[in-house]
């Protein structure tokens, strides 16, 4: 099974889960907490692009959060 590639941006999933993708790194916000995850665990549809501020802070957040 081929794994889908995701373009940079924000994805909305079921149950209020939001995914943030930048340069193939993925953050998931679930119940108010951020986690690192992989493209195998994105269950959402592309909603809109990341803002410039989000892009600037992405790596800082990514490096601090736990793996899902």
Regions from the language model: what does each represent?
Residues 11-59:
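Acidic, low-complexity, intrinsically disordered interaction modules
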Residues 67-68:
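Short acidic DE-rich linear segments
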Residues 2-7:
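Negatively charged, low-complexity tracts enriched in Asp/Glu with abundant Ser/Thr
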């Amino acid at each position: 099974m081929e794994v889908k590639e995701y373009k940079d941006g924000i994805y909305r999933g079921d149950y209020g889960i939001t995914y943030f993708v930048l340069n193939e790194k993925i953050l998931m916000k679930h119940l108010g907490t951020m986690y690192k995850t992989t493209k195998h665990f994105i269950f959402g549809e592309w909603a809109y692009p990341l803002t410039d501020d989000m892009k600037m802070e992405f790596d800082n957040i990514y490096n601090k959060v736990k793996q899902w």
